[in-house]
Amino acid sequence: MKNSGSIQESTSSTGISVLIVLALGFLMATLDVTVVNVAMADMKNTLSMSLSGVTWVVDGYILTFASLLLAGGALADRFGSKTIYILGLAVFVMASCLCAASINGQMLIAGRLIQGIGAALFMPSSLSLLAASYLDERARARMFGLWAALVSAASALGPFIGGVLVQLAGWQSIFLINVPIGAAALISAYRILSRVPGKSSRVNIIGHLLGMMALGFLSYALIQGPSAGWRSPVILVAFTAAVLAFVLFLLREISAKTPILPASLYKNGRFSAAQFIGFLLNFALFGGMFMLSLFLQEAGGASSFMAGVELLPMMAVFVIGNLLFARLANRFEAGQLMFVSMAVSCIIALLLFVLISPDFPYWQLAVLMSVMNLCTGITVPAMTTVIMQAAGQRHTNIAGAALNANRQIGALVGVAITGVIIHLSATWYAGAGFAFLMMGAAYSLAALLVWLFLAAHNGTAASEKM
């Protein structure tokens, strides 16, 4: 694949190289979410940070990342996916150096905010570049499965890798490891990725500012709500501002000559349904894993290290699910795989709602959660495939950005609501039961959406050209 050439169907070896290059960026972004969790205590003590301050080390990254994803997709459309991907990687690596060199909490939080900006730039572009490298829909689906497997492996191993790095070289090492990974990704991206020319259309600056404000205020309210109190003035103002900004964003989208999400995407039932399924998936997944990490320690008596060990098999099956999708994609439509996976997840979540009790053994919990997460591992690349097919080649950047934004907001909402459920429950077992019920409701709604909008289209062409 030539550096300046147009996108053509990838050869097998070149296609795998593209996959690895793009996965390196996702690897860094994913690791920096999971490894930070195990380093928070060391950061807090070394930099004399408050609990609220160290929380922002995690949440500040999510705030800028979620708020700027749509803008990242639009910039990739305007200036080219490869250009914005490389720019985002460079920003992320420099921000990692800033984090590692931090001498106080404010400097570390600033570095994390900038890391979120970099991730918001390169993550939408990576999906677009991967989609463009595989024009054959079956091959593209397989590559989405392999790509998701690499990312899932990073998520599963993140806490373990972070613990080893912190133990051997201090918390700074979890950021310094991004330097060699980022350098390899930058050099490889420049040499291997094809140049994707930008479009001459203007960037809807006002629309993006309103979208950023809506996502930013919503993210802030969800992040700060548990500590500040959901009825506190600052949280109520943030929610109100988010709603107002979202309404203005919709009005701007209707009237703008160059809307952020083209009207054809809004009207595409497959695209819209898959986007909402992405929200529901992360809502259930992150809410559930947040609950389990606390449940295993508070109700099960596990240490933080042992809780991580007990969660590992439940997380590792994501990789198996991703790889399984890559094999099943040749035989079944993405919508079929999504429906079966979501239906099974719903049944398991409702079963756990009934069974969870002090007498319920860990091994049964681990088996059921592993099957549920295996289904999620199948669903994620299937959902990505559906969205990229429905968006068409013209809109892959903004489609990928919208998917990532919806999933980030889903994760924030899921964790926030799960926290409220646990807080209001009389016991940890009651809280876990209601959390599983919430997950079952989300998975059932996702399965219904798949049945109505995706599975019914198996006999039609998989792609809807825009």
Curated annotation (Swiss-Prot):
Pfam families: MFS_1
Compartments where located: Cell membrane
UniProt entry tagged with the keyword Transmembrane helix: yes
Keyword annotations: Antibiotic resistance, Cell membrane, Membrane, Transmembrane, Transmembrane helix, Transport
CDD domains (UniProt xref): MFS_MMR_MDR_like
Membrane topology value: Multi-pass membrane protein
Gene Ontology terms for molecular function: transmembrane transporter activity
Cysteines paired by S-S bonds: none
Gene Ontology cellular-component terms listed: membrane; plasma membrane
Function: Resistance to the epoxide antibiotic methylenomycin.
Similarity comment: family membership: Belongs to the major facilitator superfamily. EmrB family.
Name of the molecule in the record: Methylenomycin A resistance protein
Species in which this protein is naturally found: Bacillus subtilis (strain 168)
This protein's encoding gene: mmr
